[in-house]
């Protein structure tokens, strides 16, 4: 883990089991994630919640920041999930996986991959329709406190409208194949 560098984080459900049963679980996770990132010194750039896994793009400000964020999630979210669903035991498949993302262009390709993945998996017709990712923020449909776009995202245009339109184009179907080919082999 390198401070000041973009990382892709992957958390998988133990034995591919669901880690979210309903929207209340997803909302609780988002709240805990936002607070943990803020308190532990990590900048959250993009996120995706799928039924059995979580993808994050995060820049830690200190060496231990990512581990501290994940530890907070492990303690608080798992306790919340287990209590709500009257279960016990582990929720996650071992330790989180982290991959260093080098280069601004590659960071945007990773974000494109994450925000387009629900469409590729048949979870939504477009990224804008999937409520549990950062795509709606980057497309200008919602404003999410605590989410800070990567510097390369800011370079997509001079105004929010230009950036959002450029991002919409990047999330278009034609761009997906290239993004998948570039990113998939390198993610955790």
Where are the model-predicted features located?
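A generic structural motif
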Residues: 54-56
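Short Pro-Cys-Gly-centered "Cys-loop" motif that presents a nucleophilic cysteine in a tight turn
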Residues: 1-50, 59-188
